Swiss-Prot record:
Primary location recorded for the protein, binned into one broad class: membrane
Membrane listed as a keyword: yes
Localization terms from the record: Cell inner membrane
Membrane topology: Multi-pass membrane protein
Pfam families referenced in this protein's UniProt entry, alphabetically: Sec_GG, SecD_1st, SecD_SecF_C, SecDF_P1_head
InterPro entries, A to Z: Acrflvin-R, SecD, SecD/SecF_arch_bac, SecD/SecF_CS, SecD_1st, SecD_SecF_C, SecD_SecF_C_bact, SecDF_P1_head
Protein name, per record: Protein translocase subunit SecD
Family named by the database record: Belongs to the SecD/SecF family. SecD subfamily.
Taxonomic classification: Bacteria, Bacillati, Cyanobacteriota, Cyanophyceae, Acaryochloridales
GO molecular function, one term: protein-transporting ATPase activity
Protein purpose: Part of the Sec protein translocase complex. Interacts with the SecYEG preprotein conducting channel. SecDF uses the proton motive force (PMF) to complete protein translocation after the ATP-dependent function of SecA. Probably participates in protein translocation into and across both the cytoplasmic and thylakoid membranes in cyanobacterial cells.
Transmembrane region(s): 7-27, 305-327, 334-356, 357-377, 402-422, 429-449
Organism per entry: Acaryochloris marina (strain MBIC 11017)
Keyword ATP-binding carried by entry: no
Length: 475
């Protein structure tokens, strides 16, 4: 038991030190140390998007708007923790709110493309014509130096005209060189970016297909393996990569459901393309109609007063716990401070953006953390008054309260999961902050409070029943 307490104390100390590093300015050198505030707390940018019909999608129906809204949200907020608000306005417009973003160029660029990815194979009928036109063009190009030396202006002009004509014909044929296959961006599960293994200081875009997409990719690469014909990867109809497939894949093609786009990308371009593909392709193009800078809903004075009120309320809770529950209350105060530190560290690590609903979720989780400690201490008092020893009372108090705490927190986490799954924007933010707070409160109430309590009673000066219950005399 003593070894276990020492281990848990060391773990708690390690977590506290790690959390301090994360939430303090020291963490800024690692890209941490800062909690993002939402649009209602610090302002930001607001984009109005116009959804435009196409020849394929002539009517912008509610289903189309819902699909566009989902893709926009997935592109701008792939992890689902930044409180970006994406909502429809009218029949053909979408409003996007970006908290804390004063220059939304990245967001505008992220939404500028439909991002329809497709894989294409060479058209064998066109391939023969391309080879013929390429040979003819090469022969004409070889004649140019001789014509220039001859000094016959008319003959040179005629030859240059023929070269331009052949180049035009070749370009037209090359536009038809690739034909679409059934492998598209719809078959992707995920997309990312990684440092290129073949080109220094360049980046590749990594793709992972779903089960059907993996099978299609294997079949496509098998048919091209060893032929010398390129596999074309196109984005919105433009070629972004062409690669040949080695003959060692003749038997089964490239299996495993993964692919790499080696397009000589810079980091920002690779990240942009990966986020576009991860978010999915837009069913119709969108155009940024308006960009506005939005001020915070609450002024600085209101925010400052709210912070003071929150700190004052927390101090009153800490004082009440210490006065009413004596030593266990003081231990609970320490556990609550650890809880707050760990929770804020989680918010920083997960990139959570705090808004007013998010703060409400955090405050609610504090209440649940206090409630868990109260359950434990009341159970402990009951055991003490029944005549049990101090150690047995504490052990039994934690054991009897555990089921109630677990049931309460699990049901809350289920509710948070439902809100996160079905909600969006501010509702998701409330669910995330509450869910993280509840999960951390379970750890601090059961592990932190328990470890500190047993550590306290291991000290002779603190092993006194009157420090736990004033109504029971010292035995």
């Amino acid at each position: 038991m003593l070894k276990q307490q020492r281990f848990l104390l060391a773990l708690i100390a390690l977590l506290v030190v790690g959390a301090l590093i994360v939430v303090t300015p020291f963490g800024k050198q690692y890209g941490l140390g800062k909690i993002n505030l939402g649009l209602d707390l610090r302002g930001g940018s607001q984009l109005t998007l116009q959804v435009n019909p196409t020849e394929e999608v002539k009517d912008i129906t509610p289903n189309v708007m819902e699909a566009v809204q989902t893709v926009v949200a997935n592109r701008l907020n792939p992890e689902g923790v930044s409180e970006i608000v994406v909502q429809t306005v009218g029949s053909q417009q979408i409003l996007v709110q970006l908290p804390g973003v004063s220059d939304p160029k990245d967001a505008e660029q992220l939404l500028s493309q439909v991002a329809q990815l497709d894989f294409r194979r060479p058209n064998n009928a066109i391939l023969a014509q391309v080879n013929v036109r390429s040979s003819e063009l090469q022969r004409l190009l070889q004649k140019l130096p001789e014509a220039e030396k001859a000094g016959d202006a008319a003959a040179l002009a005629k030859l240059q005209g023929e070269v331009q004509q052949k180049q035009k014909q070749l370009t037209e044929l090359q536009d038809q060189f690739f034909v679409k296959t059934d492998l598209t961006g719809e078959d992707l599960n995920d997309a990312g970016y990684a440092i290129s293994q073949s080109q220094p200081n360049k980046w590749d875009v990594t793709l992972r297909f779903d089960v059907d997409g993996g099978k299609k990719f294997a079949a496509l690469t098998k048919s091209l393996a060893g032929t010398g014909q390129p596999l074309g990867i196109f984005l919105d109809g433009k070629s972004i990569s062409q690669a040949t497939v080695s003959d060692r894949f003749k038997a089964n093609g490239i299996t495993g459901g993964a692919a790499i786009i080696t397009g000589n990308f810079e980091l920002e371009d690779a990240k942009l393309l990966a986020n576009q593909l991860k978010g999915g392709s837009l069913p119709v193009p969108v155009k940024v109609e308006e960009i506005r800078t939005v001020g915070a809903t609450l002024g600085q004075d209101s925010i400052r007063q709210s912070v003071y009120a929150g700190i004052g309320g927390l101090i009153l809770v800490l004082i009440f716990m210490g006065v009413w529950y004596r030593l266990p209350g003081l231990i609970a105060d320490v556990a609550l401070c650890v809880y707050g530190l760990l929770t804020f560290a989680c918010y920083v690590l997960f990139g959570v953006t705090l808004t007013l609903p998010g703060i409400a979720g955090f405050i609610l989780s504090i209440g649940m953390a206090v409630d868990a400690n109260i359950l434990i201490f009341e159970r402990t008092r009951e055991e003490l008054r029944s005549g049990k020893t101090l150690y047995r009372s504490i052990e039994s108090g934690f054991y009897r309260a555990f089921t109630s705490i677990l049931d309460s927190n699990v049901t809350t986490l289920i509710a948070c999961g439902v809100l996160y799954w079905l909600g969006s924007g501010l509702v998701r933010g409330f669910a995330v902050t509450l869910g993280i707070g509840v999960a951390v409160s379970m750890f601090t109430a059961i592990t932190c409070s328990r470890t500190l309590m047993f550590t306290a009673i291991s000290l002779p000066n603190l092993r006194k029943i009157e420090l736990f219950d004033s109504k029971r005399a010292v035995s």
